[in-house]
UniProtKB/Swiss-Prot annotation:
<dbReference type="InterPro" id="IPR011332">
    <property type="entry name" value="Ribosomal_zn-bd"/>
</dbReference>
<comment type="similarity">
    <text>Belongs to the bacterial ribosomal protein bL32 family.</text>
</comment>
<dbReference type="GO" id="GO:0015934">
    <property type="term" value="C:large ribosomal subunit"/>
</dbReference>
<protein>
    <recommendedName>
        <fullName>Large ribosomal subunit protein bL32</fullName>
    </recommendedName>
</protein>
<feature type="compositionally biased region" description="Basic and acidic residues">
    <location>
        <begin position="28"/>
        <end position="44"/>
    </location>
</feature>
<feature type="compositionally biased region" description="Basic residues">
    <location>
        <begin position="1"/>
        <end position="16"/>
    </location>
</feature>
<keyword id="KW-0687">Ribonucleoprotein</keyword>
<dbReference type="GO" id="GO:0003735">
    <property type="term" value="F:structural constituent of ribosome"/>
</dbReference>
<dbReference type="GO" id="GO:0006412">
    <property type="term" value="P:translation"/>
</dbReference>
<dbReference type="InterPro" id="IPR002677">
    <property type="entry name" value="Ribosomal_bL32"/>
</dbReference>
<dbReference type="InterPro" id="IPR044957">
    <property type="entry name" value="Ribosomal_bL32_bact"/>
</dbReference>
<keyword id="KW-0689">Ribosomal protein</keyword>
<dbReference type="Pfam" id="PF01783">
    <property type="entry name" value="Ribosomal_L32p"/>
</dbReference>
<feature type="region of interest" description="Disordered">
    <location>
        <begin position="1"/>
        <end position="44"/>
    </location>
</feature>
Length: 61
């Protein structure tokens, strides 16, 4: 059975656990519509991605 040679210090234990924290997702404001969206994602309101129309937008009637 594997047994640790040395006691893990509180600092090292904390550094290992720092990756477990939940991080809030980042949002950017779209230049054209002003809507908040995730970076590198399509703007669902306009259907644009990187200045190109990639999605047909349904018009509300």
């Amino acid at each position: 059975m594997a047994v640790p040679k040395r006691k893990t210090s509180p600092s090292r234990r904390g550094m290992r656990r720092s990756a477990d924290a939940l991080k809030a997702p980042t949002y950017v404001e779209d230049k054209d519509s002003g809507e908040l969206r995730r970076p590198h994602h399509i703007d669902l309101k306009t259907g644009m991605y990187r200045g190109r129309q990639v999605l047909k937008v349904k018009t509300e009637a």
